[in-house]
Amino acid sequence: MSKKVAVIMGSDSDFPVFAPAINRLKSFGIPMEVRVMSAHRTPDAAAEFSKTAKDNGFGVIIAGAGKAAHLAGVLAAHTTLPVIGIPVKSSTLDGLDALLSTVQMPSGIPVATVAIDGADNAAILACQMLALSDEGLAAQLAQMKEDMVQGVAKKNAALQEKVKEL
């Protein structure tokens, strides 16, 4: 069985953004814990969670927030586990502020950052990391990619039929 994935959001209002990640992890059978923590309002709890995550069976941390989105970086500062950051779009600057806060990390404290509101890709990336030591998960990911190839081929075939009808 794969290690757990921590899914940490800065506010409960971020849940709709994180739902695709939770659903994707469930679809791959990945055990997870979903929590709300704040880099600014609960910094000690965030640091403690991150410091103990590896010992508690986690293999990857997915974290995100909006505005001054320091959550992923704070978690990354306190662990050697991979941290995947999700910048969350808020009313301020359409998420650009969160993107820059998440991606612009100092040397030595990396955060693998996905697109603004890119929770599904965050979950897929977490699965790819875990699949390095889980052949069953690697096979599931390969099947997902093959399904995408087949889906595009079907769409292309349908498009070619529409073009012929013009």
Spell out what each predicted region is:
Residues 92-139:
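Short, glycine-/small-residue-rich phosphate/pyrophosphate-handling segment
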Residues 34-55:
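N-terminal beta-loop-helix "entrance" segment that forms/cooperates
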Residues 3-41:
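Glycine-rich phosphate/diphosphate-binding loop of Rossmann-like nucleotide-binding domains
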Residues 22, 47-50, 77, 94-106:
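Active-site-proximal loop->helix
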Residues 49-87:
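Glycine-rich phosphate-binding loop
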Residues 130-166:
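Glycine-rich phosphate/pyrophosphate-binding loop and the adjoining helix
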Residues 14-18, 42-46, 65-74, 93-96, ...:
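Short glycine/serine/threonine-rich phosphate/pyrophosphate-binding segments
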